[in-house]
A protein has these predicted regions:
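A compositional/biophysical signature of low hydrophobicity enriched in polar/charged and small residues
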Residues: 1-154
Length: 154
């Protein structure tokens, strides 16, 4: 919905869109934050348009689940590393998809080899580096370029 995509709408604008009082919108947002339905607010940055070096990696991680705790305990150990931006339990050929950001491939490689791979339950890792982002969180990151070339006809 439009509300989900445009989370920076003012309470007044949300109230108008939903045809309810502003206090009702404010109270509902506060309740959803308390209940952890709304978990945070994020700014989406296209790092390619800045002078800052930023590299995103996705790491496939195979683990051995721990008795009585399944995947939850190892997931917690992984997501508590400050470098880690996201951890997902996956179906298919591996167990977790770990997303992290760093300045260089070496920095990410060092994290994987010195912190992630040595964890007790980790069986293997495969690292993929993002070369270019075209769309992120529903937002196209590059403006369409108009082809200004003229057609040549014989």
């Amino acid at each position: 919905s439009d509300v989900y995509k445009r989370q920076r709408l003012a309470i007044h604008d949300l109230a108008v869109m939903l045809d309810v009082a502003e206090t009702e919108v404010a109270n509902e947002i506060a309740d959803m934050e308390k209940e952890h339905i709304i978990c945070g607010y994020h700014t989406l940055i296209n790092w390619d348009n800045t002078s800052k070096d930023q590299l995103t990696a996705m790491i496939e991680v195979k683990v051995t689940p721990q008795r009585g705790q399944g995947f939850d305990r190892i997931a917690e150990r992984i997501y508590n590393f400050p470098e880690v931006k996201a951890v997902y339990l996956m179906s298919g050929g591996y167990d977790f998809m770990v997303m992290l950001e760093g300045k260089t491939m070496k920095e990410i490689s060092m994290f994987t080899s010195s912190k992630l791979a040595p964890l007790e339950s980790v069986v293997s890792t495969v690292t993929h580096f993002v070369l270019k982002k075209y769309k992120d969180h529903g937002t196209v990151l590059e403006a369409k370029k108009v082809d200004e070339r003229q057609a040549v006809t014989p």
